[in-house]
Amino acid sequence: MKRLIHAFWMCQSMFCAIPCPCKTWDEEARYALLWCLPLVGLEIGLIWWICSLLCLYFGLHQLIVGLVLCTVPFFATGFLHLDGFMDVTDAVGSCRDLARRREILKDSHVGSFAVIGCVLLILGQFVFAGAAADSAYLRLLIVIPVVSRCCSSAAVAVLPKMSTSQYARKKA
């Protein structure tokens, strides 16, 4: 149980911008991270939902609510997922061979496809967040990060690993 709790704090420190007490890496708890990822999603979803309730409580304009709902998940994750989205958009948009796309993923420079993808993503989120600002579906804000992280965990657990992935190594 202690290792699972430590894995949760490790997961939060990696995938969330909320400060946590975990400062050390435990190699043996690495595989438990996949189980903890949906819990971090729940934490982010609750923050997102509470922010939406506060916006409605204070009667903020629909555009401001859209802006808040669009930006909260980025700030809660420390922009980690936006950075990853931009890297993948850049690699896929390059239409290059697999080896070159892997190089693009590792490159720290931002390419044109990354910028275009980022702008479209943020505009899309803003439009949908603004449209849903006074909707009864706001409770889904809790579920969306949980489901996305469940899918991510399942993908890491089931899909073939890249040779450079830490999960490609055999368990000790």
Regions found by a protein language model. Give the residues of each.
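Hydrophobic alpha-helical transmembrane segments
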Residues: M1-G78, G93-R102, D107-S108, F113-A172
